[in-house]
C-alpha cells in the first residue's frame, strides 16, 4: 500500500523569483547588455570605483566579490568591424573607377558645363571652369561631384533663357536632344539607353505642354541633356551645302545669260544657323512678295504679279511645317523680290520658274510626306488590309506629332480614329462586313481596293456644285468676276485661286471613269442614273435661282439635296441597289417663280380672265396629278414610269408658263382643246408605314334614334373593335360625340398596328373584319344606348390598298335605314399591286393661238 506522502520542506526566500527568471518572466532588460553582449554590469569593480571617486566617498570594503562576467570587446575587434564597413564603400568606389573613361558621360558633362569637346575650354560666362580642370586630376573618390554640377548648370541655363518663353525654348531644345539620343541609341542597339531617353522624352513633353498652357513646373525636375556621341563638326558640312547651292545656281543659268550679267539672278542667301526666329524671317519675306505682287498688279504687270504671288504662297507651306515643329531647311529660301527687278519681263517668268521653284522646294524636304497636296503619296495598297494598315499608321503618327506639339485635343481625336481603324482591321480579319465609308480618309491617300474613291470635302463639293450650276446659267459670269476683282482688294482673289483649279481637275479625272462605267451598266441601272442626274440638275438650277434672289438659306438647302443625290449616283454606278423611295421629290412650283407684268393700257375682258383662270386651274391640277403618279411609281421602284410622269409634269409646267406669259402681255386666251388620255397608275399611300393600317370613320347618314329620343336630339358616337393580334388583345377605340344630329360628320383617323406577314393578321382580314357599334350618349344618370351595329369585311385589301364602304346599320339582323361610311388604308396591297387605269381630259394649248 502506498505510504504517506513525504512532507515538503519550507521554501527558501527568493526561490520563486529565480524560477520566474528561468521561465523568462520578470526579466530585466538592460540595453547595454543587449548591445555589448554582457550579462551583468552592475557589479563591475572599475565602474564602482570610478563612481566613488566622482562622489568623493570611500569604497566599502565589505562589498561582494564581482562575479565573473564577459569582458568588453577589445578595440582591435572594433577597428576590424569598422574596416569591414569601410571596405564596401571602397569597393564601390573601385567599381566606379571606370566611369571616368566613359565617353558618353564625359560628353554629357561637357555639354552641361559648356566645355568644348576638342579643346576642353569653358565659356567665359560659366563659373565652373576651374572646377572642371581640377576634376580631371582628382582621385576616384571625388567622382560623385558630377551630379551636383548637373543640378547647378540646369537653373543657370534656365535663368539665361529668360522667363517662361526661354523655359519653353529650353524644353523644346531638350526634347530635340532626347529624340536624337533615342534614335542614335536604337541605331547602336543600346536598348536600355533608348528606353531611358524615351522616359525622359515623355517627361519633357508633359512639361512642355504644361508651360504652353501657362502652368508652372519645377526647374529642378527638368531632365538633364544627354550625350549624342561624337558627330562630325558642323563646319565640315557648310562648304558642301554652299557648293551644292552654287552648282545648282550655275546649272540653272542659261548660256545666253552670260553676256548679260546685269539680268542674272542673285545667289540664294543661306540662312545662318544662329538665326533666332526663322518664322519671323519667313513671314517678312512672304509679306515682301505679296506687297511686290500688289504693286506689280497696280503697275499693270500681271505676269510678274502672278509669279510673285505664286512664290509667296509657297511660304505658307513652309510656315505650316514650322508651326507643326517639323525641321525645315531654309538654305534654299528665295531672295528678296527687289533682287528680281533686273529681269526682263519676257524672260522673268521662265527664269523664276527654273531657279526659284527648286529653291522654294529645298525649304520643305521634310514636309513631302505630310502635306495632302504633295505628289509623294503613299504606295498603292494591294489589299484592303494593307490600305487599312497604312491609314492606321498615318493617324498614329499624326497623334504622336500632335501630342509632341502640346495639342492634346487633336491627339485624342487622332487616337479615336486610329481605334476605329483597329476595330475595322479586326472585323475584316474575322470575316465580318465593314462599312469603309464611315472611316475617315487621310488626305492624299489612295482609295481602298475595290471601292469607289471618296469625293472631296463638303466645302469643295459645294464649290463644285455651285460651279456646275453657274455653267448652266445663260449669263456671262466672267464680267461679273472681273468687276468683283476690281472692287475687292488684290489679295482676296489671289487667296481663292488654289481652291478653284481643284474642282475641274477632279471632274476631269472622274469623267472618263463615269463614262466607261455608264456604258457597262444594265438598262435598268442606266435609267436610274439618268433619273438621279436629272433630279440633281433640277436642284442645282433651283439653288442658282435662289442665290440670284439672295435667298441663301434656300440655296444651301437645294445644294444639300443635290449633294445627297451625288452619293446615290455613285452607288448606282457601282451596281449597288438604290431605294428610289428615298430619292427627293421633284421641285414644285412656287408663286414667286413667275413675275406678272400688268399694263395699265391693256385690259382683258371679264370673260378672258375667267378663261385664263380656268385654264390655269386645270394645268395646276394635271401637274399635281403627274407628280403624285411619279411619286407612287418611284416608291414602287419603277424608273421608266417615274420618268414618264415627270416629263408630263414638266410639260404641264411649261404650258402654265406660256399661259401666264400671254396673260401678262394682255393677249387673248390661246386656242386650246382637250384630248382623252388613259394613264396606267399604281396606287400607293407612301405616307404610311408597312406596319400600320389607317381606319377613317367618315360620317353617319340618317342614323336611327333610340326610343324616346328624336332624330334631332341624337348624340351619336361610334365604337369599333379590331380583333388583332387576338380576341383578348383586340384594338378598340371610339370617336368623339357629335350632338343634336342623326347625320354626324366624324372624319376621325385611327392608327392600327399590324404585321403584314403574320398568319393571324391574314386570318383576321379574310374572316373577321372590323365590328362597329353606334351609340347614343346618355345623360348624367343614364347609360349609353345602342343604336345599331355594322360590320366591315377586309378581303379586298389583298388586291387594293384602300377600301371605301358605306355600310348598312343593323338592329340585330334587321336593317334600320341608317348608313355608316368608313375607309381603310394600307401602304400597298397584301398580295399584288393596286393597278388602276385613269382616263383624263388632257388640256393641250395650241401654239398658233399665241
Curated annotation (Swiss-Prot):
It is found in: Nucleus. Residues 440-450 have a biased composition (Pro residues). Residues 167-213 form a coiled coil. One of its GO terms (biological process) is negative regulation of transcription by RNA polymerase II. Residues 1-21, 54-73, 114-145, 215-277, 436-525 are annotated as: Disordered. The keyword Ligase does not apply. Residues 1-10 have a biased composition (Basic residues). Keywords: Coiled coil, Nucleus, Phosphoprotein, Transcription, Transcription regulation. This is Coiled-coil and C2 domain-containing protein 1B. It comes from Rattus norvegicus. The lineage of its organism: Eukaryota, Metazoa, Chordata, Craniata, Vertebrata.
